[in-house]
Structures are given as C-alpha cells and as structure tokens.
C-alpha cells in the first residue's frame, strides 16, 4: 500500500529531475479511493512543488460520487485530471451515468479542470481495430480532452503508425507517449494479457536471456526504455511519460541515459 509517507519519500526523489507533471493513480492510496489519490496529488503539489495529475475513473461511480471527488480535488487545488473509464472489478456494479470517459470529460471541463484522456497506440483490447478506436479517441477530444497519454508500448513503430492515423482522424490535442521498463517476465505477460501490447523481438530476447537474472533484466530493460525515449524524442513527439510503478530510480536511470545521449 502506498501511504502518504511512502508517496512523499518516493516523489521527493523525482524533484531534481524537474518533470512536467507526476501522476497520482486512482488506486495510488492502496484502494480505489479518490480521496487517497487527491491527498497524494496535494503532497506532490503543495509540499514538493511539482505539477500533479490526478487519475479519476468512473466505470462504477454515481454522479454523486464523481461530484464529491471533484469537490475534493478543487478544495485541494488540483487542476489536472486524467479522465478514465477504468475497469470493473468483481462485485462492482456498472455505472448507469458514466459508461465511458466521454461521459466524465464534460463534467471536468465544466469545473475548469485541464483534462487528459487515454490513448491506445495498438487499440483498446475491446475495440475491433485501430480505426474503430480512433473514433473513440476523437470523441474524447470533442468532449473536451486537452491532451492524451498513451497506454504503454514497447514498439515505437506501432506508435508512429498510430500517430499518423490519429492526425489523419483529426486529433490535434498533444499526445504524450507512455513508456514502462519491464521488471519481470510476469509483468510483461500481464501487460500483454490486459492491454494487448506487442513485443518486438529485441525485448523478447532480453526477457529470455535474463529470465533468471533480475538485476541484469532490470538494467537491460531500462536501457531498452531509454532507447525508446531517445528515438521518440528525435521524432519530435509531443511528450514522454515514464510509468515507474513507484520506483523513482527507474526515472533517474532513464534520465541519466537520455542526458548522456544528448552530450
């Protein structure tokens, strides 16, 4: 469980990297609790002077619950929200008011939030194909999304194909690329199962070569992620977002490799 004290200690190690923003996920406090998320976002913003982006999911939420969550965010001075549908867990009842992120985004805009939304370079697993998924992406933009953050991907070529198609579909909002270094073979298997991400041959070789050597796997994966980031930056993407899973050393090491490449 990520307590406020652990969040404070973890995030403090990112301050010297000067990130444009830091995410507080909707389950950051150890449960799907919007107050826990807003508390961590407030720590980022008020104590560490970093721009916070709070995640907010709506798939099982009532209008009253969302209104309460937005009140709490505004009271704490949080201005940036990533609007997500979220996945239902066993025992939860689907919301009748919020079926998609497009139902949540207009409420956030009415409240004056800067709103981000999710993008899927390889299409959301529930979509037939990327073309269908791009229709939903455009709907999020039309609903008021100011920017997008992508699901993680390991193959930059998948992103470049998506980027071209998104522009052709009328997407003008900035798209920030989400990159996550893999820390274990099990983690990758979960991502492939849950998100449908593809694995380039190079990352498969890394996983197989270092399956029984966690330290070497970690080092090789961070180097691979840094190569992705460098290539994306050279292609002039709108932004880069590292999914560190509360491991600040991942961001520190990736940034070190990026800076070395730019010298």
Label each residue range with its predicted role:
Residues 58-71, 95-99:
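Glycine-rich anion/phosphate-binding loops
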Residues 22, 73, 140, 144, ...:
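Conserved, mostly hydrophobic/aromatic
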Residues 15-40, 87-96, 145-159, 244-248:
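Glycine-rich, proline-tolerant flexible connector loops at the mouths of alpha/beta enzymes
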Residues 1-7, 52-64, 116-132, 209-223:
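Active-site mouth loops of central-metabolism enzymes
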Residues 159, 248-263:
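C-terminal helical cap(s) of enzyme catalytic domains, especially alpha/beta-barrels
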């Amino acid at each position: 469980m990520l307590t406020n004290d652990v969040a404070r200690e973890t995030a403090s190690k990112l301050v010297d990297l000067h990130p444009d923003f830091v995410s507080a996920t909707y389950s950051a406090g150890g449960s799907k609790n919007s107050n826990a998320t807003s508390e961590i976002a407030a720590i980022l913003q008020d104590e560490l002077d970093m721009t916070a982006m709070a995640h907010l999911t709506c798939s099982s939420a009532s209008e009253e619950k969302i209104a309460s969550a937005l009140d709490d965010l505004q009271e704490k001075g949080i201005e940036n929200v990533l609007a997500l549908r979220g996945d239902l867990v066993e025992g939860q009842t689907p919301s009748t008011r919020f079926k998609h992120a497009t139902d949540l985004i207009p409420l956030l805009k009415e409240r004056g939030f800067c709103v981000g939304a999710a993008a899927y370079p390889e299409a959301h697993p529930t979509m037939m194909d990327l073309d269908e998924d791009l229709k939903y992406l455009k709907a999020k933009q039309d609903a008021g999304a100011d920017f997008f953050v992508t699901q993680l991907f390991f193959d930059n070529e998948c992103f470049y194909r998506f980027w071209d198609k998104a522009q052709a579909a009328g997407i003008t909002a900035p798209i920030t690329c989400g990159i996550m270094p893999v820390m274990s073979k099990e983690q990758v298997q979960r991502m492939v199962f849950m998100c449908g991400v593809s694995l380039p041959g190079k990352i498969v070789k890394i996983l197989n070569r270092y399956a029984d050597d966690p330290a070497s796997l970690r080092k090789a994966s961070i180097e691979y992620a840094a190569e992705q980031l460098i290539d994306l930056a050279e292609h002039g993407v709108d932004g880069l977002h590292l999914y560190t899973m509360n491991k600040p050393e991942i961001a520190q090491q990736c940034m070190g490799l990026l800076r070395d490449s730019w010298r």
